[in-house]
Amino acid sequence: NKNDFRWDLTLQASTFKNEITSLPSPFINGSKRWDVGRSRFDFFLLRTAGVDPDTGDQLFFVYEQDDNGNSVPVLDANGNQETTNDWQDTERAYTGDSSIPDLLGSISNSFSYKGFTLDVLITYGIGGSVLDNAYAGMMHSGNYGSSWHPDILNAWKQPGDITNVPRLENGNVNLVRTQSERFLTDATFWSLKNASLGYNFDKKFIERFGLNDLRLYVTGENLYLNSERTGLDPQYNLAGTPPGDDFTPPRIVSLGLNVSF
């Protein structure tokens, strides 16, 4: 019976832009550089150029600062941008990435059929980038008592290896620079934020027991998250720089009974 079925759908989507209009002088704020005419969420990092297949060194594109403090690429005689294996021989530069999602919103569904109800809330974000500090912390070049990410198995091992993970050298902090675009990750995600399934018992049935209403339900929160990398939760940090030691909200499942006399 179609008259017993109801479906309510609510779609929400939002986006926003920002621009710094006044500032005494530009300055670096963490992974960003604030300057007039730019967004405060534009990433300003070391630009990486892959891994040297001969040595396993992390390579960086070379930039230098002009008279206005802006980073400009350094070119060789052939017009190609120079690279270096020493991050101290270059400057940070804008990567062209922002931590602001292109679209942020939710999809709410509410179904009812006779005594059954089902409510589902999905949240999502499309676009934007996040500097994955947790991942960077597990891609170190070798520190005693620290865990590694499985991607460390892709590290350079011998001349000729083509990989984006530099060689391992215990204690050499110069091989891994967290403030580099190597650890920029797509912040797109979708999450099954909440789902609730319930049943309202028939009035005639429950009146036999002296009840006015009887409802049984099961509810789940933070049930599923899909993001670019397992464990990465871009939902709660608009700056795109989660500290790496934070915890995402736990998955909660609860069973309930509402009784009205």
Question: Which stretches of residues belong to each language-model region?
Answer:
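Conserved small-residue
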Residues: 1-99
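Outer-envelope beta-barrel architecture signal
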Residues: 3-9, 103, 114-116, 188, ...
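Outer-membrane beta-barrel and related beta-rich outer-membrane complex signature
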Residues: 8, 19-34, 127-156, 226-234
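Membrane-embedded beta-strand positions in outer-membrane beta-barrel channels/transporters
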Residues: 8-10, 106-108, 194-198, 254-256
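Membrane-embedded beta-strand positions of outer-membrane beta-barrel proteins
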Residues: 9-11, 120, 216-218, 257
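Transmembrane beta-strands of outer-membrane beta-barrel pores
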Residues: 13-19, 113-115, 124-128, 194, ...
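C-terminal beta-signal and terminal closure region of outer-membrane beta-barrel proteins
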Residues: 30-55, 152-161, 177, 225-261
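Extracytoplasmic gating/loop element in the C-terminal half of outer-membrane beta-barrel translocons
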Residues: 125-215, 221
